Amino acid sequence: MHLSDITHPNQLRNLNLSQLRSLARQIRDKHLQTAANSPVGCHLGPGLGVVELTLALYKTLDLDRDKVIWDVGHQAYAHKMLTGRYHNFHTLRQKGGISGYLKRSESRFDHFGAGHASTSISAALGMAIARDRRGDNFKVVAIIGDGALTGGMAYEAINHAGHLPKTNLMVVLNDNGMSISPNVGAIPRYLNRLRLSPPVQFLADSLEEQLKNLPLLGSSLSPEIDRLKETVKLVTAVQNNKAGIIFEELGFTYVGPVDGHNLAELLDAFELAHGISGPVLVHVATVKGKGYPPAEAEQVGYHAQSRFDLATGKPYPPTKPKPPSYSKVFGHALCKLAERDPRIIGITAAMDTGTGLDKLKEKLPDQFVDVGIAEQHAVTLAAGMACEGMRPVVAIYSTFLQRAYDQIIHDVCIQKLPVFFCLDRAGVVGADGPTHQGMYDIAYLRCIPEMVLMAPKDEAELQRMVVTGIQYTQGPIAMRYPRGSGVGVPLAEEGWEPLPIGKAEVLRSGGEVLILAYGSMVHPSLQAAEILKEHGISATVVNARFAKPLDTELILPLAEQSRLVVTVEEGCLMGGFGSAVAEALLDADLAVPLLRLGVPDVWVEHATPEESLAELGLNSAGIAERIRAKFQARVLKGSPAELPTVNS
């Protein structure tokens, strides 16, 4: 059977091992071809590692009834191909195409949406409890990676499920020893030992089956068989120090470890697990990047890939050289400062490469901490370090810091501890879509008393803000910066001067319009001012630098002299930078027209950052056009002949 003929996953139920193996090869080929030619890039290693797992599990289920909950979603590319999306798979992560993650609105087989890790067991348990309350009878399976198992939420769910012995729930642990980077901590170390141990549950259940088949005696031996099974598991555990006793103690029946690339073993394991009452965990050992040697050899680099040569595995060089990314500039600056100050500690939540802290990890490993996928712990860990005079720097994507909101307020801000939050991927993130957009940090941090918020206009100013954040000791301070390359300004190797807290700068003086731009929107606003000049509108452009405290000493006099005030931010309008300016104008009783440009009350779907910004009207042409329209309607009271439409 050809993969393109699969329109429903239940078609797998009638296939033999040979046909399943053929499908596995086709799935990997399709995944690799899509990744190698994708204009936006896609995740690679995780999906290649779960092909056999997906095929075997789906063969044992009735997916018209049963529900599979995938953790995160970039494991689920085989799932997408098997659930009616094969012919659209080439559009993966592109504007108008299929999502790179699970999405309930995209397919009836995507039972729970996810982009952040460690949520699957909680969601699956909720569905299982609802099923039992209604008296339904379908299977619920959560598939979680060992990286996601470093997140505390997974253990909260396991703890709950383990106390519900009559609730049938299967958890499949996809254990490849990695999240994006190699996993850290005691739990991954324990799982690594388990990967090498014999299949304990198979041994115990095989013994049970043989004893029960003894003539005359078998049916009367049930209590003794149970005790013998436990003895077998315990003896195996003692001999190998690797059996899944921790999961058994938490109330789960443990099955495994199973070879995640052996379809026959997987089918046996899943059939066995389906017959076990109560919570059961099937431990499947997989190889990230399986079937593509470059991805198996370099598992961190091939977690996700932009376009590459399939024959060699090497990425295609960019058409023209790009400036260094904000993440790299940040990592370099922090490393330079840490070399001179041993109090500086860089903290990440399983994202050392993505945040630029890999440089610190390499050069100064004693000043680097990776806590795993545990953002809550990362923030309170930093709070504890700050109590003891260290200078903790928490580098986390904007979207992931949301997971530690209580810790930010309760453990850091109330105690006025000098923790420096560095929010990477702030603003639109592109192909990852709504689960990863960094739209909300300005709003959710600005409302916290005494929190300082800053954003650089370019990579050179970012260097100065790193120094500013390190030297600020009066309490918490946060810096946000976008995904991708800087604007290409010259960079000094060191000697960066700190910025005065709460002070903005005027970059361009005009007269009629005052544009207050924050962070990544400064350069598009400068370009918009040039466009407006061509159409007879003069504009002052201010680099706000700080959303809190706002530089009212600079802003209010300029606003009073202007006919229109405009705020521009790459974040949500509700509660954001524009709201801060609106509050300041109201408090000062300044009745000047105000236009706030930013992200409205919508979910921003996956697309390239450029496509998203254009759609939101946050590129230079869009900013200029919206200012022109507002100026014409509210200030000039309508005179279209004077102001031609700006071409976007």
Swiss-Prot record:
Belongs to the transketolase family. DXPS subfamily. GO terms for molecular function: 1-deoxy-D-xylulose-5-phosphate synthase activity; magnesium ion binding; thiamine pyrophosphate binding. Binds 1 Mg(2+) ion per subunit. Binds 1 thiamine pyrophosphate per subunit. GO terms for cellular component: cytosol. InterPro entries: Dxylulose-5-P_synthase, THDP-binding, Transketo_C/PFOR_II, Transketolase-like_Pyr-bd, Transketolase_BS, Transketolase_C. The lineage of its organism: Bacteria, Bacillati, Cyanobacteriota, Cyanophyceae, Synechococcales. The keyword Metal-binding applies. It catalyses: D-glyceraldehyde 3-phosphate + pyruvate + H(+) = 1-deoxy-D-xylulose 5-phosphate + CO2. Thiamine diphosphate binds at H74, G115, H116, A117, G147, A148, N176, Y292, E375. GO terms for biological process: 1-deoxy-D-xylulose 5-phosphate biosynthetic process; isopentenyl diphosphate biosynthetic process, methylerythritol 4-phosphate pathway; terpenoid biosynthetic process; thiamine biosynthetic process. The keyword Magnesium applies. This is 1-deoxy-D-xylulose-5-phosphate synthase. Homodimer. Keywords: Isoprene biosynthesis, Magnesium, Metal-binding, Thiamine biosynthesis, Thiamine pyrophosphate, Transferase. Its cofactor is Mg(2+); thiamine diphosphate. The gene is dxs. It is an enzyme of class 2 (transferase).
